[in-house]
Amino acid sequence: MVQRGVHFFSGVPDSLLKAFCLAIGSNNGGLAHRIASNEGCAVGMAMGHYLSTRTLPVVYMQNSGLGNAINPLCSLATPDVYGIPLLLIIGWRGEVDDSGKQLHDEPQHVMQGRVTLPQLNVLDIPHIVLDGHNTPPWDDIQALLQRAHDEHRPVALVVRKNTFSSPAASANPTAESALMRREAIVAACLNVLPSHLPIVSTTGMLSRELYELREQRGEGHQRDFLTVGGMGLASQIALGLCDAQPQRKVVCLDGDGALLMHMGGLTNTAQASNLIHIVINNGAHDSVGGQPTAASRLPLAPIAAASGYGATYYAETEEALQAALQQALQAQCSQFIEVQCRVGHRSDLGRPATSPAQNRDAFMQFLNTPPQLS
């Protein structure tokens, strides 16, 4: 791609593209690379690059993020509007093999995996599927890139699992820091939060850790809504609960990457007087490879305060976190707690044994049962 004049890359990291992301992130050959807060923003940056340089930009994403990119692809980059050539590189979770059989994946990837290629067809985006066993000739890929230039349109490479070789482990200075691990932070929250409060947890490792902690503690899962997909929307789900049940406090366990993806939602959640919004900030996309987020150099609590939260806190220790939680539980306005965290998770971390539908039903029953105050 570099030989074809590609020098700009932007997107949201994906586990299937981990080696690719590592390569462009560590390249010292003059490549411009910016990790985007969401996929639509990446398309916007790619457009700006093309308008300035006339060279083909690359936007990378997991297929679950294609929805975030559809608006700028359809209303800006399409040949019907500005006609911006760009290359999408899309990790295909929930992929369908050549025989039409869908490979096993987590529930949140099933529908998106099934509709990824039809979605690109409907969007009129020419595409090629890549895999590690039957890679198309380079001439075909070159022809696709040339088509992007000639027809002034987006094109796509759809990447199956194991297309790229596994990346070498890279050192992360925050991985061995003195900060708490995320799992310990979640455990500390559970030690303080009353059992009658509902918790909405964000996408990725955090929800898996919450589930395992409930198992270890012999507690049920009915009070927790695990937001397994829809990255960045856990806080908005929590806001919906706050509005529907103003008599009870609602807790959102969020992450920095998720918060950044739809950060405009802070101006809405800040208005919920019964919300306790806890953001665990490790400055990384931990679930898909540990690539840095903008929050690695950006304090989030002041942003929350400027967005209208009634009170904000910052914690690096369990003692500071517990003190913030105790104050938040007594407050009568929206509360935002930023907890600094080291990167990393247990290698043996499991996945929920219950289905999303079972989680939904148990959570709804919990919400509609009079709370036993404790």
Report residues per predicted region:
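Thiamine diphosphate
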Residues: 1-121, 125, 129-151, 155-239, ...
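DG-centered beta-turn motif at the end of beta-strands
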Residues: 61-64, 248-265
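A short alpha/beta connector and helix-capping loop motif
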Residues: 74, 84-86, 262-281
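A contiguous pocket-lining binding segment that forms or flanks enzyme active sites
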Residues: 276-310, 314
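Active-site flanking residues adjacent to catalytic metal/cofactor-binding acidic residues
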Residues: 159, 253-256, 280, 339
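Low-complexity intrinsically disordered segments
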Residues: 339-346, 350-352
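A short, acidic, amphipathic alpha-helical segment used as a generic capping/interface helix at domain edges
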Residues: 142, 146, 317-330
